[in-house]
């Protein structure tokens, strides 16, 4: 049951109320501001869980991210330094860093958000609307539409009791084709006073084979060298 205070009809929540509840649920504005970097370590499961990669993701304000997946001595990397994205794809036979296209970088820019899509949405230039409740695997979640400055649209589903994100459905145009990516979030754990999802399952909406990230360790505000986010010079 949704809390009576935020029932449908005239007592429906406003966007500002939901965002405020989301910030409070994450640990509060002060704790969020104090969280300057995150290092998430765990495993990445692909191919319906048959293949397991060692997983590391590092995020640093104001908008840097680096994600690594390692298997049999090879490490794939995707990174964004706040301006441009790059990748190393050894599993596709490409061991030199390559610049990523503007379309490919969009998902990295969103990954880089330590706070998620709702916090500081006005400052980010987003447009946010509350669309009522919608069922998410049996939970009557609050559905919030976020139109980002780059044109991407994310539907953010908030748990009605805890006000944390449980699903984000993002729609974007990538290389001329429309795509929908669904990400389910759960198993929140606290780091430096902020709740962080440690179970992340994502893939194209409706696809049977989604990749799953299980985080075993969350480290907050540790030393992070800015160099790791910048594209190294490709070897000639």
What function would you assign to each model-found segment?
Residues 7, 74, 137-233:
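Gly/Pro-enriched, hydrophobic low-complexity segments
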Residues 53-58, 78-82, 96-105, 158, ...:
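Short amphipathic beta-strand/extended segments with alternating polar/hydrophobic composition
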Residues 16-93, 123-135:
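N-terminal mature ectodomain segment of secretory-pathway/periplasmic proteins
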Residues 86-115:
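Acidic/charged, solvent-exposed loop-and-adjacent secondary-structure segments enriched in E/D, K/R, S/T
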Residues 1-7:
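Hydrophobic h-region of N-terminal signal peptides that target proteins for export
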Residues 24-31, 113-118, 202:
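Intrinsically disordered, low-complexity boundary segments flanking structured domains
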Residues 107-143, 164-167:
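Short, conserved active-site entrance elements at the starts or edges of catalytic domains
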């Amino acid at each position: 049951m949704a809390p009576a205070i935020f029932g449908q009809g005239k007592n429906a929540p406003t966007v500002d109320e939901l965002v405020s509840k989301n910030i409070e649920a994450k640990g509060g504005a002060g704790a969020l501001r104090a969280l300057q970097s995150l290092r998430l370590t765990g495993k990445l499961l692909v191919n319906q869980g048959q293949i397991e990669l060692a997983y590391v993701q590092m995020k640093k304000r104001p908008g840097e991210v680096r994600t690594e997946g390692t298997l049999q001595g090879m490490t794939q990397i995707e990174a964004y330094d706040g301006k441009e994205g790059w990748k190393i794809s050894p599993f596709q036979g490409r061991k030199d860093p390559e610049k990523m296209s503007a379309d490919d970088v969009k998902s990295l820019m969103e990954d880089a958000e330590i706070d998620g899509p709702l916090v500081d949405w006005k400052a980010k230039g987003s447009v946010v609307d509350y669309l009522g409740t919608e069922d998410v695997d049996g939970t009557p979640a609050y559905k919030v539409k976020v139109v980002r400055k780059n044109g991407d649209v994310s539907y953010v589903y908030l748990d009605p009791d805890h006000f944390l994100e449980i699903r984000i459905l993002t729609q974007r145009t990538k290389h001329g084709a429309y795509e929908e990516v669904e990400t389910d979030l759960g198993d929140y754990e606290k780091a430096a006073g902020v709740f962080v999802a440690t179970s992340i399952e994502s893939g194209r909406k409706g696809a049977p084979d989604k990749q799953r990230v299980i985080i075993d360790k969350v480290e907050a505000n540790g030393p992070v060298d800015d160099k790791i986010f910048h594209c190294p010079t490709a070897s000639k």
